[in-house]
A protein has these predicted regions:
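Substrate-recognition "cap/lid" segment bordering the active-site pocket of phosphatases
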Residues: 94-95, 123-176, 182-191, 205-206
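N-terminal helical cap/lid subdomain that shapes the substrate entry/recognition surface
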Residues: 2, 7-18, 22-104, 111, ...
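Surface-exposed amphipathic alpha-helices with a cationic face
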Residues: 103-110, 185-190
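Substrate-recognition element of Asp-dependent hydrolases with the DxDx(T/V) motif
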Residues: 105-132
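Glycine-rich phosphate-binding loop signature in dinucleotide/nucleotide-binding domains
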Residues: 8-9, 112-114, 168-174
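Short, glycine/polar-rich helix-capping loops at beta-to-alpha or helix-loop-helix junctions
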Residues: 200-209
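Short acidic-hydrophobic, aromatic-tinged amphipathic segments that line or gate anion-handling sites
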Residues: 215-219
Length: 228
């Protein structure tokens, strides 16, 4: 009897974005932004608009949320950013949840020997706190948030992704980069990695297609089907 050949896994590691990919954080972010907008008597923003503001760190989020005539006042941005940090600290676990099917998907990846990591432009303390809260049972090779103060540039610079590849002891060709935005697709591409764009995230499939995602996943199960 001829035995069927065992499927060879091309990918042995995955790097995930956090907000809009693993976790739905938009309501807590929007509420925190609006707390600060209200404090300064500026117009409020809905979640749809906030989805287009996030992805490049808290400072960019706050700058984009401010009225245009105040966006270039760096000292004022610093002041508002400090207020946002206080508001988000109170709210960041209020409504944030993993997307449906995410926990099961990550667990299944680990059962199949796939290494995982998180690479986010979110502040490092919140990135680590959220991963510890929702993925405590899942070993991550690395959990990286924004580290510019340590000389590591933010996404889409590939520095953090390549650092994770070294930790995984894998080549870029063996790693998939998964996220929900142009920033994530460019990060993966800049690191020489194939990319999966998740259509359930903050930006949607059209932005992911326009930025040449290797594959578009409509749900977490699609990721498992693509990889395993």
């Amino acid at each position: 009897m001829i035995k069927a050949k065992k499927k060879i896994k091309k990918y042995k590691g995955i790097i995930f974005d956090l907000d809009g990919t693993l976790l739905d954080t938009i309501e807590d972010l929007t509420d925190s932004v609006n707390d600060v907008m209200q404090l300064y008597h500026f117009p409020q923003h809905d979640t749809k608009k906030c989805k287009m503001m996030v992805g490049n760190g808290f400072r960019k989020l706050i700058t984009r949320a401010l009225p245009e005539e105040r966006q270039k006042d760096e000292q004022f941005v610093d002041e508002v950013l400090a207020q946002f940090a206080k508001a988000y600290h109170k709210r960041y676990l209020n409504k944030t949840v993993p997307y449906e099917g995410i926990l099961q998907m990550v667990n299944e990846l680990h059962k199949n020997g796939i290494q995982t990591a998180v690479n986010s432009n979110k502040r490092s303390d919140y990135t680590e706190a959220l991963v510890n809260k929702f993925f405590a049972q899942t070993p991550m090779v690395a959990v990286y948030g924004e580290r510019e103060s340590k000389g590591i540039p933010k996404k889409p610079d590939p520095a953090a992704a390549l650092e994770i590849a070294d930790k995984m002891k894998l080549s870029s060709a063996e790693i998939l980069y998964i996220g929900d935005s142009e920033t994530d697709m460019k990060t993966g591409q800049n690191a020489g990695m194939d990319t999966i764009g998740v259509a359930w995230g903050f930006r949607g499939a059209e932005e992911l297609k326009a930025n040449h995602a290797t594959y578009i996943a409509e749900n977490p199960e699609d990721i498992l089907k693509y990889i395993l």
